[in-house]
């Protein structure tokens, strides 16, 4: 990380403050926030349970499990656990509403949709979808579940908007495990990229965007890039360092006069990068106002990439970035895009950094909204918990921006009109039934949101 950025980060952390006015009326605002999401739930009990569970997710509980949330309300844990793991309610309408709300709030025509997998380490073999697979959190192959997430990023902010649980092929073929975990019969094996395309088809229209981005797991298959191209989407996807590319801008080998005209050979993208002269790199000062400087260097070039079947892909733009680390080494990232070659380096950099910033979404959701705190094993419980956690994270996102951009006291009186509805669903005395270490969540959200939006000047 740039030292100037570290210094600015320390200053902002010292300045972060949550006032009592910001916390006052929090639960009535949460109730109002949840109303459009819970319209698809039938019956008052489900709505009340959803409110209780979401309240627990934004609370100061150390472990935001169903059991912990039940204890928060001094209730029998079976009621909460039944709501999450057994009650038949469809989570998809809530996620569609979430995408629409995020798209409306953060709306920018050149927004970025980001796909990113995230793993949850698990012990045993009973949790739905658990298998030995790559776990980024641990940096190795481990026993874990993997969710594929869809996020939306603009200069204003960014948020997770949808998710799918990746079900390994070994699971889809095992009838016993499927039955025990309650996997619906309609669920067939789908690759992580197919899950991403499903979410794009479902929510893409609600998220104004001109870019699709993702990490090197998403960018590796040429077939996924082809699908996006076919859909008319413009992408900037990270690719692994061993991706084979051919420089189509380089001079061709001399023709011998016989046979086919020679072409430049395919080489690894990191080897191609290593041969670049120093003057090939352009310095870009990525600024986000008061939120700290970030200096990177970048290069772009038209290339063709080798496909998995050994064929030659269409022309794409190779975009490279490097950032100097504290030890004076460089962190290198490699991307392929179907954008026009004349797209400015600064625009490619904006999209690349927006994709990286989604990691902050995971940190918030896991650290403050209990995304990974679940202790459930079956299919619907995983999706129910994940859905409500994404809603909780989005609520905290909104609260952080409300506290930063407006006078919190102006909003307190606005909750009076809904107090009667709120009293039916939550305890009258917030301080008694709801632990307000939620302040920690809002401080953290304010601090991270201060760092996230990117603009270029």
Please name every model-derived segment.
Residues 2-4, 9-213, 217-244, 251, ...:
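Conserved, well-structured functional cores that handle cations and Mg-NTP chemistry
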Residues 16-26, 111, 348-364:
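An acidic intrinsically disordered interaction segment
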Residues 31, 156-181, 185, 189, ...:
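An anionic, glycine-rich sequence signature occurring as long contiguous blocks
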Residues 146, 357, 387-390:
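Catalytic-loop motifs flanking and including active-site residues across diverse enzymes
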Residues 150, 199-200, 365, 391-395:
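Buried hydrophobic packing segments
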Residues 337, 343-352, 367-383, 403:
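Short, solvent-exposed helix-loop connector elements
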Residues 341, 354-358, 363, 367, ...:
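Short, well-ordered loop/turn and helix-capping segments at boundaries between secondary-structure elements
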């Amino acid at each position: 990380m740039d030292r100037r950025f570290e210094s600015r980060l320390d200053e902002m952390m010292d300045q972060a403050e949550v006032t009592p006015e910001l916390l006052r009326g929090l639960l009535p605002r949460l109730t109002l926030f949840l109303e459009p999401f819970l319209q698809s739930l039938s019956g008052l009990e489900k709505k009340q349970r959803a409110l209780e569970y979401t309240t627990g997710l934004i609370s100061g509980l150390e472990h935001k499990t169903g059991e912990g949330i039940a204890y928060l309300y001094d209730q029998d844990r079976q009621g909460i656990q039944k709501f999450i793991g057994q009650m038949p309610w469809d989570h998809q309408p809530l996620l569609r509403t979430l995408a629409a709300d995020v798209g409306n709030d953060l709306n920018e025509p050149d927004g970025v949709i980001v796909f990113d997998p995230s793993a949850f380490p698990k012990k045993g073999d009973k949790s739905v979808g658990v298998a030995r697979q790559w776990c980024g959190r641990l940096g190795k192959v481990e026993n874990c579940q993997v969710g594929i997430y869809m996020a939306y990023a603009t200069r204003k902010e960014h948020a997770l908007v949808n998710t799918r649980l990746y079900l390994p092929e070994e699971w889809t073929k095992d009838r016993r495990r499927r039955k025990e975990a309650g996997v619906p019969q309609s669920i067939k094996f789908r690759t992580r990229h197919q899950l991403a395309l499903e979410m794009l088809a479902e929510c893409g229209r609600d998220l104004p965007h001109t870019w699709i981005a993702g990490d090197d797991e998403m960018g590796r298959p040429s077939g996924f890039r082809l699908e996006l191209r076919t859909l008319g989407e413009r992408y900037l996807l990270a690719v692994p360092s061993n991706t084979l590319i051919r420089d189509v801008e380089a001079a061709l080998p001399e023709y011998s006069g016989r046979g086919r005209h020679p072409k430049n050979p395919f080489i690894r993208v990191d080897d191609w990068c290593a041969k670049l002269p120093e003057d090939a790199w352009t310095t870009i000062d990525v600024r986000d106002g008061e939120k700290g400087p970030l200096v990177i260097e970048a290069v772009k070039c038209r290339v063709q990439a080798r496909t998995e079947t050994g064929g030659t892909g269409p022309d794409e733009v190779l975009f490279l970035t490097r950032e100097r680390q504290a030890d004076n080494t460089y962190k290198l990232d490699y991307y392929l895009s179907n954008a026009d070659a004349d797209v400015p380096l600064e625009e490619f950099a904006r999209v690349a950094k927006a994709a990286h910033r989604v990691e902050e979404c995971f940190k918030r959701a896991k650290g403050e909204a209990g995304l990974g705190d679940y202790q459930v094993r079956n299919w619907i419980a995983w999706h129910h918990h994940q859905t409500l956690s994404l809603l909780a994270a989005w609520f905290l996102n909104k609260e952080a921006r409300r506290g930063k951009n407006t006078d919190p006291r102006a909003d307190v009186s606005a909750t009076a009109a809904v107090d009667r509805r709120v009293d039916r669903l939550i305890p009258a005395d917030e301080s008694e039934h709801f632990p307000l270490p939620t302040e920690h969540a809002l401080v953290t959200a304010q601090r991270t949101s201060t760092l996230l939006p990117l603009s270029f000047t």
